[in-house]
Amino acid sequence: MAELLALSPSRANDFVQCPLKFRLRSIDRLPEPPSEAEFRGTLVHAVLERLFDAEADERTIETAVAGIGPALDALREKDPETVAQLFPGPDEVSRLQQQARTLLEGYFTLELPQKLEPAAREEFVRADLDNGLTLRGFVDRTDIAPGGHVRLVDYKTGKQPKPQYSGEADFQMRFYALVHWLSRRELVHTLQLFYLGSRTTVTKRPTAADIERTEAEILQLWEQIARAAESDGWRPRRTPLCGWCHFKPICPAWGGTPPPTPEITAIAGR
């Protein structure tokens, strides 16, 4: 059995990309194998989170690089099987550490952490819409300027996508700006994406109209999700991304057969 009562940016983007993918992840909750890219991102995020534990003048690239080993050890202790599967030998571990170092060097070309005192790091945020749907997720970093302006920061360990493929990340940041508004009645001043792989940033300043548009967009999307749940209409959508989807072997669009949909016992707004 499953309940559809909450939505995160990643699951929302899953549905936009492919309703069946959303179902298999959010309702069936089928396991997926770990990937090197995801693990590398988790490692770099952990190092950047801990970087701000150091005194301001010690937040250097040397301190960050020195934090790779301890962060990796903590992840290995938490999930030794995944680390052993992805990085079975010293050569693979060394390559991972070098890749992490390169990404961290990229971060230091984008800002000076010595001048920042984040208000929050890796913060779980949530807020409820009027229809009962809970919006939730994790914000990498929240900064508050002396004048009170709020900046939400998200680290991306990949490269900045071309404009036609930037919608997913843009929606994610608008989603968090909406959650901030709903929970604090405060308009976020700046949304900033740091693409460490390409050493570039994307900065946006949301308006009240942007917040209203995002809420309407999410409500419309949730209506589509609710209808799919009520009719069991989780249609697959073939795209070039199918080649990277773990569920391709059981996808009807590719000749597969998915398992029966688990019973859905509750849907927000219904």
State what each model feature region is.
Residues 47-121, 128:
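A non-catalytic, helix-rich entry segment at domain boundaries
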Residues 43-54, 224-228:
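Solvent-exposed, amphipathic alpha-helical segments
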Residues 6, 147, 179-270:
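Metal-dependent nuclease catalytic regions and adjoining charged, substrate-binding loops involved
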Residues 28-37, 54-59, 162-163, 232-233:
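Short, polar/flexible loop-turn hinges at active-site or ligand-entry regions and domain interfaces
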Residues 1-38, 267-270:
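C-terminal, charged and often intrinsically disordered regions of DNA end-processing helicases
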Residues 118-119, 123-218:
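Mg2+/Mn2+-dependent nuclease catalytic core
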Residues 1-20, 125, 139, 149-150, ...:
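Anion-coordinating catalytic cores for phosphoryl-, nucleotidyl-, and glycosidic chemistry
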Residues 36, 40, 44, 96, ...:
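Hydrophobic (often cysteine-bearing) scaffold residues that line and stabilize catalytic clefts
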